[in-house]
Amino acid sequence: METAIIAMETQLQQMLNNLQIAKNEAKEAQQKVAKLEVEISKFQSGIEMMKQFMPAITSEVCKQSVVDPSSNSEKMQEIASGKKPIAEGVSATSPEQTATGKDISKPLMADALPKSINSTNVETSPVQTVTGKDSSKPLMADALPKSINSVKTETGKKSWADIATEDEREPSSLVQLPLSGKKFYVLFNTPRKGIFSDWSQIAPLITGVKGAVHKSYPTMEAAKKALKDAEQMNGLKASSLEKLQPRVPAKKRQSIQEMVMARGGFKQNTPQNTYVFSPENRTMVNKKIFEWKKDEPNSEFYPIEIRGQTKIVLFPGADPVFAYTAYLMGYVKQIIIFEEFKFLSCFPRLFANCVEKFYNKIGRRETVINVRSSFPLLDETMKIRIPAINVAVMAMFNKQFEPFAEEIKLDIQLEDVLASIEGVYERTQKIDERSKLKVWYQSDSTILFGTSPKEIEDVDIRSLLRFEEMFKAMETGPLVNLQDEERKILCQKMQKYKGHSCQLCKSESSGPQTSEEGLQESEDEDFSVLV
């Protein structure tokens, strides 16, 4: 009942966390909408400013260009309705030259208009005369042509239609559209921090990443300065910003071991494991398991029965020393993980980090580690001579618990130890190329898998085959320390598997006696063809 309550509390806490995340995302979305509204209002104000001057320009054009209203009334209607351009509809005041060669057409005067939108208020505008002197004349609209109806002549003058077309091709610098400049984006945290020149490069690195901090800057220099200041504030060593460019993933070849290690993602500053197995710890574990009572609440473990032997299910409330000692003794069948990882602090640091990373990968949901392990062999001084061999698989917990053990049995004999070693090898034989697993951690005595939506890859198959070498020849790994009598008994148990071929098998003249049933089973489970 207490376990169920803990599970319900965990689920409620997870729901609260999800609600908080959704609330933060909604707040960020509102801020983005507000920024977009501000930019849209700026754009609309620019359009309204242009609309204010268009009626005044059109009316002044009509006044200066029309000489005979009766003769040009039809053309003016066409101009007003937009069916005909101004330069084509109004032609009564085309430029004429006198005998002296002077142009008698008058320039369009726009005394009521400002000189330009961004100009300062002045009373006169200097105009250069033919003699090169400046003379003050009434303020003219510089953006307008001097002659509305002037056409391109042999002297190189341009018509109003040509000038209007050029204005359309070359937008005026007076009205700048928002969000039109180049931006550089700085990602201040996460492993991929740096400067990116395009939004498409940084978007995948921040989408769905909690706590990712980024900001845009108009220039590369400003982006570099911001990143350098952030690194100095965090106490980090500033990188070489001169060489900092948009990142491109480096395609480097990794060895099998490097690929397996990379999945753990452990930090170099993680403290080393200082746990040492001792007879006192072994006695403490046996005493706790023997003294367990069904009617008393226990947040550390509870015993179950597997193949006539007593195993335990570990909970996050377990003492770290008890948890790891029980694991080394081969007592652990399941490890249940909710949100706490402190009880794994005595495990190898890479093992614990792989478990935490898998927990985060599946959305921080309840996780279970199913362990198939052997019992260790101890020497006369009660030190481990052959460690427990473990095959563990991480998966999402389905909230189904094993029944309690009716009787606790911890009297382990040599036959039980060798049978448990054979059981571990049998578990590895059930993994084939169709299994949806991935190797997360591997050592001499432990291989840790995690469930995956994809079928097992070749690199993981090769890691499994390396792990199985100790069972096939018994000349590598932990089994190299087997005594002759122990090796002989284990060899007899392993002869039903096709992959087993030790020196004892080769020394027998008749060869290994492989049963028909065992041969068929090993043929189905052999994956040497994949290497």
From Swiss-Prot:
UniProt keyword Nucleus present: no
One annotated GO biological process: regulation of translation
Cellular component, GO annotation: host cell cytoplasm
Chain intervals with Acidic residues compositional bias: 518-531
Taxonomy, superkingdom: Viruses
Keywords linked to the UniProt accession: Host cytoplasm, Translation regulation
Chief localization: host cell
Pfam families in the cross-refs: Cauli_VI
Segments for region (Disordered): 80-101, 505-531
Biased composition (Polar residues): 91-100, 505-517
InterPro entries assigned to the protein according to its UniProt record, in alphabetical order: Ribosomal_bL9/RNase_H1_N, RNase_H1_N, RNase_H1_N_sf
Subcellular location: Host cytoplasm
Additional detail: The inclusion bodies are the site of viral DNA synthesis, virion assembly and accumulation in the infected cell.
Protein name per Swiss-Prot or TrEMBL: Transactivator/viroplasmin protein
Species the sequence originates in: Cestrum yellow leaf curling virus
